[in-house]
Design a protein with these regions (language model features):
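N-terminal loops that bind phosphate or other acidic moieties
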Residues: 4-410
Length: 410
């Protein structure tokens, strides 16, 4: 296991630890109503989306789909991970999303209903993306088999990108699905929008999964609305004061280790677990200095934008100094949350060749336009690829250009 020098916690970490119990206070006490209201809000903020409330399905209005013959892309899972995945329903991303209750997979019948009744009839196939958790794999898998029995052409891609639980402990279950799943959705949604066939969409989706590594860290476990305050206290005490948990899952699953360190020390440990090829238990993807990568810094939910920016800065600095890696694209924000968790996830995607030709590289697909409320409005590919001046003009240069004033002090 990767190790690092231990430091005293920085003031920011102390502040978050002291206020973590505030996460047990919520505006809504009924979790079922909270889920339905949140799903309905998507139809308010995205007029092209519809809600099947009985089955908790958000789907695109058929009249909003310009090419109904294209492959449909469906994802889903438990609620509480907003904006993933209902917030990704829209042009260039998902055709539909099937939601469960908080941190619980939707039922197989919900999935079957979505595949049979909530997608364009002319679609040349359906790509279903499920995160690698037992309930999701089981229920989405059963829903897919039911749809196939009805004559639907369906492919299932299971997304697992976590390195927090190594091979020895994960066994045949494999890696848990984390924020890297958002990149799988983005790539597959862009391919489907370009009219690529189902087999190639599924092939590239699995290619993305195979080249993803993600790792989370959190200062506290989250409290689910509707559950007792005592449970929140127990969760907090389980972690212990002054500690950050590395490898914590998005459903409060325990991590791989608890450390007392500052941000640079934490990032050093995390990147080592993600990229160290000598760690045979976690070396899932070989990434060399010559490889192109994309970086996603994902917010669990309650890390401030200020602190998330500082985390991004530290990760990029250490990637360059320690590994000789410079991300071709960087996305920062909340894509796959964990309610109000005070944590973050680092996801790194190795930009390998899709073998689909011009305009269909992973970089092209990440850059492709998307029209959904949950996908961040990023700067353009042109902005990323333009070479700019390395540094601003020195202050002294401006001073020399400024004419002296004739004003005199009295």
């Amino acid at each position: 296991m990767a190790t690092c020098q231990v430091h005293l916690p920085c003031p920011t970490f102390y502040r978050l630890l002291l206020t973590a119990n505030a996460a047990s206070k919520h505006y809504l006490s009924d979790p079922n109503k909270a889920v339905l209201d949140a799903l309905n809000s998507i139809t308010l903020t995205n007029p092209s989306a519809l809600l099947d409330a009985q089955n908790k399905i958000i789907y695109r209005n058929p009249s909003a789909i310009a090419h109904p013959e294209n492959v449909s892309v469906v994802c889903g899972g438990g609620s509480g991970h907003e904006p993933g995945f209902a917030g990704f329903v829209g042009d260039g991303l998902l055709t539909a999303c099937v939601a469960g209750t908080i941190f619980a997979s939707p039922a197989a019948e919900q999935v079957r209903t979505c595949l049979q009744h909530r997608l364009p009839a002319k679609s040349r196939g359906v790509l279903v993306i499920a995160t690698n958790y037992t309930g999701d794999v089981l229920n989405f898998g059963m829903g897919v088999e039911k749809a196939r029995a009805l004559g639907k052409k369906v492919e299932l891609v299971v997304s697992g990108d976590d390195v927090g639980v190594g091979r020895a402990k994960s066994g045949k279950v494999g890696r848990r699905g984390l924020s890297g799943t958002a990149l799988v959705v983005k790539v597959c949604g862009a391919l489907a929008a370009q009219g690529v066939d189902l087999e190639d969409c599924a092939k590239v989706g699995r290619l993305v999964v195979d080249n993803l590594v993600s790792l989370g860290a959190s200062l506290s476990r989250v409290h689910v609305p509707g559950r007792g305050i005592e449970e929140a206290r127990e969760e907090e005490e389980r972690l212990g004061p002054g500690l950050v948990e590395i490898g914590m899952g998005v459903h409060n699953e325990p991590g791989c280790e608890k450390v007392k360190t500052d941000l640079p020390g934490l990032v050093k440990i995390m990147l080592a677990q993600m990229l160290d090829q000598n760690d045979r238990d976690r070396a899932y993807v070989r990434i060399e200095k010559t490889d192109d990568i994309m970086l996603l810094i994902n917010n669990f939910g309650s890390v401030s934008n200020l602190e998330l920016g500082a985390i991004t800065n530290e990760v990029v600095t250490q990637l360059g100094n320690g590994y000789g890696l410079k991300p071709r694209r960087i996305v920062q924000g909340t894509l796959f949350g964990s309610l109000s968790g005070p944590g973050f996830i680092i996801s790194i995607l190795k930009l390998v060749d899709t073998e689909l030709g011009a305009g269909k590289s992973l970089l092209n697909l990440i850059d492709a336009p998307a029209n959904a409320i949950g996908w961040p409005k990023c700067v353009t590919a042109e902005t990323w690829e333009t070479t700019y001046d390395s540094s601003p003009q020195k202050t002294e240069d401006y001073e020399e250009m400024t004419k002296p004033s004739n004003l005199k002090c009295m």
